[in-house]
From Swiss-Prot:
One of its GO terms (molecular function) is ATP phosphoribosyltransferase activity. PANTHER family: ATP PHOSPHORIBOSYLTRANSFERASE (PTHR21403:SF8), ATP PHOSPHORIBOSYLTRANSFERASE ATP-PRTASE (PTHR21403). This is ATP phosphoribosyltransferase. It is found in: Cytoplasm. It comes from Burkholderia orbicola (strain MC0-3). It is an enzyme of class 2 (transferase). Lacks the C-terminal regulatory region which is replaced by HisZ. Heteromultimer composed of HisG and HisZ subunits. Catalyzes the condensation of ATP and 5-phosphoribose 1-diphosphate to form N'-(5'-phosphoribosyl)-ATP (PR-ATP). Has a crucial role in the pathway because the rate of histidine biosynthesis seems to be controlled primarily by regulation of HisG enzymatic activity.
């Protein structure tokens, strides 16, 4: 008996916005990860299962073959580096942007012009390092895992690098966006070995995902 294909997803927005793409492939996930304690979820296709992992872990599960394919944000993939992954499709879901933000009273442009060394809090350390290095801005990076908006408010950092959707959370915490680093959307990523060895099983699903993403779900 052939092992089922394994799709790695994270809870929340990416999971919810992937469901219509799965539906386009004729597949439904039969349990809700928000209410189920299970981390391996069956689908209506006996040859496909879904595993629920942290968003930042999706590329690792796919890279090492624990999952055949997955959906991950560009932010996560840039930090990961993309080793061992084939990235055939931008799914155009979970869209947002990665930006630099500061407290409303902080003159970021002036600090940069004067060559000030800035403390920047982020969980996207590699991306932030490359961005500021390319602009010639001197920074000390502080790795945080959440509540990024708090860092400037309590004097931990001069700026943050984080994902922004509507900007409502920034505004609520008296922060302003001063620089966009990149536009973010979620991509389909495929294990390179699986693409060769399981191509017949994978291709119909990948094709359905691509069609659905181009048609807006």
């Amino acid at each position: 008996m052939t092992a089922p294909l394994t799709l790695a997803l994270s809870k929340g927005r990416i999971f919810e916005e992937t469901l219509p793409l799965l539906a386009a492939a004729g597949v439904q996930v039969t349990e809700d990860p928000e209410t189920s304690r299970k981390l391996i979820l069956p689908t209506t296709n006996p040859d496909l299962r879904v595993i629920i992992v942290r968003a930042s872990d999706v590329p690792t599960y796919v890279e090492y073959g624990a999952a055949d394919f997955g959906v991950a944000g560009k932010d996560v993939l840039v930090e990961h580096g993309g080793s061992g992954l084939y990235q055939p499709i931008d799914l155009n879901i979970a869209r947002c942007r990665m930006s630099v933000a500061v407290s409303a009273g902080f003159d970021y442009a002036s600090a940069v012009r004067q060559g000030a060394r800035l403390r920047v809090a982020t969980k996207y350390v590699e991306t932030a390092r490359e961005h500021f290095a390319a602009k010639g801005v001197h920074v000390d990076l502080i790795k945080l895992y959440g509540s990024m908006e708090l860092a400037p408010l309590v004097g931990l950092a001069d700026a943050i690098v984080d994902l922004v959707s509507s900007g409502g959370t920034l505004k609520a915490n008296n922060l302003v966006e001063v620089e966009e680093i990149m536009a973010i959307s979620s991509r389909l990523v495929v294990n390179q070995a699986a693409l060769k060895l399981k191509r017949a099983a994978l291709k119909p699903i990948l094709d359905a995902f691509e069609r659905a993403s181009q048609n807006g779900g």
